[in-house]
Each structure stands twice: as structure tokens, then as C-alpha cells.
Amino acid sequence: MAAPQLIFVDGTFAELAQEMAEYVQIGEQVKPYLAKEQNEEALQAIIEASHVLNSIPEKEFTGAYNLLIHLVLQSKDPLKYLPPLCGNLQKPITSSPAHGFTLAANALSTVFNLLEPDNPTRFNVLLQITRFIRQHGQYDLLKPRLENLEGWFNLWNTSDEDQRRLYVEVSDTAAEAGDDEDSYRYLIKAIATFGREDQDEITSEEAQKLSLKAVRLAISHPARFDFQDLRILPSVQALGDSHPVYSQLLDIFIEQDLEDYNDFKDEHEGWVEKEKLDNEKLQRKMRLLTFASLAASTPNREIPYANIAKALQIPSEEVEMWTIDVVRAKLVEGRLSQQQKVFLVHRTTYRVFGEKQWRELATRVDQYKSIVDQLLVFLRKGQADVEGQREREQQELERKLAGAGMGGGPGGDRRRQQKPRTDEDD
């Protein structure tokens, strides 16, 4: 989307409309409308013939479309004419195959930017722009503007349904551009527009379809390990009734381990393959999540290689490789002790934080409290020892001073006494 711009036109609506009509070769047809001041009828005829602008010389394209956009925005009902105008811009610019995308993108941006910021019609134009961007695979051009999306929705008072339409369009556009992170993020935003208290809405076909898509994206994405934003959505929770197997699989990825996943596969033999899910990717992800759970549940923060190999169901010689992978995934921080054959946990990520995790946290707090209590005892003993030593040194100093004659008593003052002065001394 281009930066905001102005277009400069000079003339009355009738003069400019007649000029445009001549340009699209319907001058005679439009004259009677303009003579009777039937401006809407004249504009309708011009819009219907405006597809010919896609074949005019490249150097005339921007000026012609700017004039057409100006005429549309002078209408009593611009929304009536904007869809066909934007639709024409999404068709090939035959006069400029090399620069057609840029020419059309600039024209669409002009429409958007010339509308008042709070004009709800901007929503429809933005939807058309998103579809145009998707058609040409240029998501990176749209992405920076999407940061304003929620603010625009508030400004335009956009309905939940329309918000969902645009979020889904953006999600699909991002997916086709290979931006899986944005695709998932906007899909979650789309699902969140379903009314939380409206049971009919969250169990609707559309809600269940989008929720199922989000679950598949979440469990399949190699770098997504947090599913809490997904699980709290009512329509996703409703999958427990409409798609119970998917719901069960999601629960495994949220808080269970590799053994549970393998049991799931045995229970639903062939289901993963039938649903076209990649078992190798899912299994790898479950191993990483299982490692994270193991690290979080180990009280002494030291995990023997043997425990890791058992939990991940891997040969012992692969333990170090998987440890490196889980650290790279930022699920765990720590270091390997090859000499002791243990992994020393510095920090771990809790996959969920429920009653079990609170108990583990309480255990660790008690352990830390015990350590702190021991430190306090040690510090107090050290402080008492220091004070005792200081007192002994003070007593020793006083004893030495007394022995050196500084304390008074017999022989304590060896200074020669002065003889009283008399007259004979003179």
C-alpha cells in the first residue's frame, strides 16, 4: 500500500464526468444524463465502461484512474461504485504487463487514502486490497499496515462477521506467502470473533472449520509449543463434541508426553495418515515437549542421560543431540555434563500451569526455604564467631596495655618528680 497522496482536479462534476466519458468512449451516451443533472446515472454508465482503462497507455493510466476515483468519491453513494472500480484494478493491466501490479496497487491505495479515516467504506477497500495482494503474492507490502488493523476496526465500528472475513483473508494471504506465524496469528484472531456466549455461533460449521484448521496448524508447526491461546477459545473447546479425536490429540500436545502420543496412535490406528498429518514431525515435536515436561518436573534440576533416553524413547547416544535441539527451541536452558552424564537445568518452560505444577512449585519453594534457613544458620553462627573473636581480641589488647604500665598502680609512674623551686635556686 502506497503512502497517502492527493489528487488535483479542476472543473465541475459535469465537466469532469464528460471528459471521462469521452475517454472510455461513451461520451454521447452520458451527455443527456449530465444535461438533466442525473449525475448518478452518468457515473453508473462510466463505471460500467471503465474496464477499458486497463488497456490505455501506461503513462495515462494513473491520471485517468485518479479522475475516475475523484468522480466516484463525489457520488452520494461511493460504496455502490467502488467494488466494480476495485474489481477492474484486480484484472490484468494489458498495456503494461511489467508494471501493472504497481500501477493497480497505487490506484487502490489512492482510493483507501482519499476516504476519511473513520469512513467504514475503507473496510471494503482494504478487503479488496488484501485480495489483490494475495493474488500477486506480495504479502510483505501489506504486512506493515496490518499493525493498524484493530484500531481501524474500532474506528469503523466493524462487525464481528466483517472482522472475521478480513482476518481469514489475511491469514490465507500470509499462508500462501509462507509466513506461517502470521497466518496462525490472524486465524486465531478470526476465531476469537465468534461470540463466547453464543453456543450456536461457536458450534457453527464455520467456527468448527476454522478451529479445526487452527488445531492442525498449531500441532504441525515445528516451532509452536504454546497452545494456551488456542485452548481457551470456546469454538476450539467445542471440537470435543464435533471432532473428539482432534480434541484428544490437542490435549496430548498441551500437557501430555510421547508415551501418550504413541498410545493415541495405537488407539486410532491409521488416523494420523488418513488426516494427512506428518507423523514424523508430530513425533519429533512431542519428544521436545516431553523433554520440557521432564525438566520442569525434576526437583533437583539434574536429569541423568538415562532418564532422558527413556522418556524420549531414543538411544542413549542421541541424548546430547536432542538436548541441543530442545535448548534451541527455547523450551529449556541448561548445560550438559558429559563427565557426570547429566543435564543441568537452569530454566524451563511450563507447558501448562495447573494443580500439578502448583504442587511442584510448592515443593521447590520448600526446598529453597530449607536452603535459605541453612544459610541463615550458617551466617548467624559466622556472625557470632566474629563477634566472639572481636571480644577476645579486645580483652587481649586491654591485658597487654595493663601489663605495659598504662593502667596505674606501684611503679606505674616512673616520671621524675619536679623539685619545688626556692629563692636559693636563683
Curated annotation (Swiss-Prot):
Domain PCI: 179-350
HAMAP family for the chain: eIF3m
Annotated localization: Cytoplasm
GO cellular component: eukaryotic 43S preinitiation complex; eukaryotic 48S preinitiation complex; eukaryotic translation initiation factor 3 complex, eIF3m
SMART domains xref list: PINT
Family: Belongs to the eIF-3 subunit M family.
GO molecular function terms listed in the Swiss-Prot or TrEMBL record: translation initiation factor activity
Protein name: Eukaryotic translation initiation factor 3 subunit M
Region of interest (Disordered), ranges: 385-426
Assembly: Component of the eukaryotic translation initiation factor 3 (eIF-3) complex.
Disulfide bonds: none
